[in-house]
Every structure is written in structure tokens, then in C-alpha cells.
Regions:
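Conserved donor-binding/catalytic core segment of Leloir-type glycosyltransferases
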Residues: 216-233, 239-243, 251-252
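A charged, aromatic-enriched C-terminal amphipathic alpha-helix characteristic of glycosyltransferases
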Residues: 344-351, 357-390
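N-terminal subdomain of nucleotide-sugar transferases
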Residues: 1-62, 240-246
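Membrane-proximal helix-turn-helix segments that form the acceptor-binding/catalytic region
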Residues: 105, 122-125, 129-133, 159-179
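A short, active-site helix/loop in glycosyltransferases that binds the activated sugar's phosphate group
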Residues: 166, 170-200, 330, 386
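Carbohydrate-associated surface elements
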Residues: 42, 185, 204-207
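Nucleotide-sugar-dependent
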Residues: 233, 278-287, 292-313, 319-331
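Nucleotide-activated donor-binding/catalytic signature segment of Leloir-type glycosyltransferases, i.e.
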Residues: 260-283
Length: 390
């Protein structure tokens, strides 16, 4: 029997969408009687060591805990609360990788195939180790492409380091068995710019395996945003054009991140900024908000696709994208007609919002949201695509 290991940084009870996706996919492997376990960190975002025991964590050594998720065993490696400092965050990644390598080496006889999920971007080091040293079948799922994102956002200004990272990443993608990406555009980029064999690249979309919540009863002029508040999200730019709107929309933000304090300074009658809250509470507080903002730096095109897109759709929110018109996000919104995309170069926000004054257009968008939820947020379809790679 093929013994599978999923390796991720985040996993429930961390309230991080990517970690929840990994856990849900693993649970579907388990339902099909596939031998599967997960290796992840201890919670970094919702961190309270006093609560670990209450949430089903069992300490088996100084740095190792175990828990279960829908019958899937999870081994957690100890970690500290996520830092928003770049230097500290990088050191956290490396520390986690070292612990992972020790664990994988000690337990290499317990698994045959390893699925590695790409955040952080340095997970490529583990993928290389898995394939070249441990000789395991290795599938690497890329949700954001580095160093391209770091370069475009000026997060790494050393050409030497950028070149070195790209060489390491390319080596990883060429030696492993399969690569998973979340858009056709990213697949085409890897083939064209990175010379990766198209036969080893599979496109599997993000999804949100949550219960679909009812749409808001009224089409009020309210927009929500929930998630990371950092440089890639480009929220400050959206707020600047939002503040010039005469449509009297209200924007409510729920989040945390490196730009949170700065964004909080913009609070006004029409802009409310709240700290991160859990999804159940988020649904309660936003049930009457019909629109959701998905904001992305205009420098990012195919390199990243916000996972919250599908979470918003499961909440039956009409999407307001704020991204480069050539981005995978803009392409998705417009191709499936689940909202609008606004270019960061747009000078007149109100002219874009006019479309929502047509009741027939809004009705069609809601129908399209239902279609997309059934097609792209179907956990059975998504998990089967991953199973076929094993």
C-alpha cells in the first residue's frame, strides 16, 4: 500500500485557509482508505499554549505533538507565533525546515510518497531533500511563485540572492515527480519561462470546503474584506480610490498583518477596520454584506492567486477584484462573471460600480457563483485530482 505524507506549514486549528485546504484533501484520502498522515507546525496564527491540550494535542516529545483531523493523524512540530518581521519570519521557516528534515529522516521508512504544499516558498528545499536524499516520490503544490513575487514587490533586492533562489527553485521543479499549480496561466509561465516539462504540471484550483451560506437578503452598499493585511494585498491603494467614491459604499475590514496598523489609521464613517476573527463569527457579522474585496498588488499577475477568492464565493459574496487586468485573479472573475475587477489605474471607481444597479446583472452573477462553487469548490473532485498524482 502506498503510504502518503502531506507536509504543510499550517494546519487546523490554525485559522488559515491554505492549511484548512490541506487538511480537507487529506481527509478525503482517508475516506478512500488511503494510508495518510500530515506533518505540520504547531498553531502559529491562533497561538495559545495553554489551549493546546484542550484542543486535542498530545505531547509525545519536547518538540513534537500529535492531533487528529477527521481521522487523519497530524504530527505537529513546535513553533513560535508567526512574526511579521521579514528576518524573524525567515528564521522561523528555516527552523521549521530543520525540524522537518530531522523528522522526515527518522521516519523515512514510514511513507512512500510526500505531498509538499508551498508556503513558505522555502518549502522547495524540503521537496529537493525528499526526492534527492530520501528518494521518495515527491509532489509539490505551488500556491505562490517565488522569487518572482518577492522581486516584483521589492521584498528582496539582491540580484545575487534572487538568482540563487530561482536556480534552487527551478532545480526543485525539474527533479521532483509532479508540480501542482492553481491556474492555467501559471502553468504556461512555468513552461515558457522556467522550461518545466508540461507533462509534470497539473492545474488544480483552490477551493473552500465550507458550507455554502445564503446570500444577503438585500443588495446593500457594503463591502467586506477578510484576511492578510500586507504589502501584496495593496489595500492602501484601494482605500485611496474608495475614499473618492460618491456612491456611499461602506468597507469593513477584518484582518491582521504587517500593514494592519497603517490601514487602521484610515478608519472613518465608511471604513471600519477590525482585528481577525474566526470564520463562524465572520459569517455572522457579514451575513448582510453582499460584496467582498479581493485586492492584489498590480505587480502580481500570474504569480499568485488569493485563496480567499473561493472562500468569499462559498459565502455567496459578489467579488470586487482590485488587481492588474492581466492577473489570474482578474481573468477568473471576468471569465466566470462572478463580479468585477477594477484596475489599480482606474480613476473612476463609481463607473465600475454602476453595473450593480442592474438587477438582472446581479441575478446572473449569483447564478454564476453557484455554478463556480459546484465546479471548483467540490472537495471530491479536487481530492481525486490529487489522489491521481500519487
Amino acid at each position: 500500500m502506498n503510504r502518503i505524507l502531506f507536509h504543510s506549514l499550517t494546519i487546523p486549528p490554525d485559522q488559515v485557509s491554505t492549511g484548512k485546504l490541506v487538511a480537507e484533501i487529506a481527509s478525503k484520502f482517508k475516506e478512500k482508505n488511503i494510508n495518510i498522515e500530515i506533518l505540520a507546525s504547531m498553531p502559529q496564527y491562533r497561538f495559545d499554549s495553554s489551549e493546546f491540550t484542550n484542543e486535542g494535542f498530545k505531547k509525545i516529545s519536547g518538540n513534537v505533538f500529535v492531533s487528529t483531523y477527521k481521522g487523519v493523524k497530524i504530527t505537529h512540530l513546535s513553533s513560535s507565533k508567526r512574526s511579521f518581521s521579514r528576518v524573524k519570519r525567515f528564521s522561523q521557516w528555516i527552523s521549521y525546515h530543520l525540524k522537518s528534515i530531522i523528522y522526515l529522516t527518522k521516519n523515512r521508512k514510514n511513507f512512500d510518497t510526500i505531498y509538499i504544499f508551498s508556503y513558505p516558498p522555502t518549502m522547495n528545499l524540503i521537496a529537493i531533500y525528499s526526492k534527492k536524499i530520501l528518494k521518495k516520490k515527491t509532489i509539490y503544490s505551488i500556491w505562490e511563485l517565488y522569487p518572482e513575487i518577492a522581486q516584483k514587490l521589492n521584498e528582496l533586492n539582491s540580484n545575487l540572492l534572487l538568482g540563487l533562489f530561482k536556480k534552487v527553485d527551478n532545480f526543485c521543479l525539474k527533479v521532483i515527480d509532479s508540480v501542482v499549480v492553481n491556474s492555467e496561466q501559471l502553468k504556461e509561465y512555468l513552461i515558457r519561462e522556467r522550461n518545466i516539462d508540461d507533462k509534470k504540471i497539473s492545474v488544480i484550483y483552490h477551493f473552500a470546503n465550507e458550507i455554502e451560506t445564503p446570500k444577503s437578503e438585500k443588495l446593500t452598499k457594503e463591502i467586506m474584506y477578510a484576511g492578510n493585511v500586507g504589502t501584496p494585498q495593496n489595500l492602501e491603494s484601494f482605500i485611496n480610490i474608495f475614499s473618492s467614491s460618491k456612491k456611499e459604499y461602506k468597507l469593513t475590514i477584518y484582518g491582521s498583518g504587517s500593514q494592519f496598523d497603517k490601514i487602521s489609521d484610515y478608519q472613518s464613517e465608511n471604513l471600519i477596520v477590525n482585528s481577525f476573527i474566526h470564520r463562524d463569527e465572520l459569517i455572522k457579522q457579514t451575513k448582510d454584506i453582499p460584496f467582498a474585496l479581493v485586492s492584489l498588488s498590480p505587480k502580481i499577475t500570474i504569480e499568485g492567486f488569493p485563496g480567499k477568492t473561493f472562500d468569499y464565493l462559498k459565502m455567496n459574496k459578489i467579488l470586487i477584484g482590485y488587481s492588474n487586468p492581466d492577473s489570474s485573479l482578474a481573468n477568473f472573475i471576468e471569465q466566470h462573471n462572478v463580479g468585477i475587477n477594477i484596475s489599480p489605474n482606474e480613476k473612476n471607481l463609481d463607473s465600475k460600480l454602476d453595473i450593480f444597479e442592474d438587477a438582472k446583472v446581479v441575478q446572473q452573477i449569483y447564478q454564476n457563483i453557484t455554478y463556480v462553487n459546484n465546479k471548483f469548490a467540490n472537495i471530491d473532485i479536487i481530492s481525486q485530482q490529487y489522489i491521481e498524482l500519487a
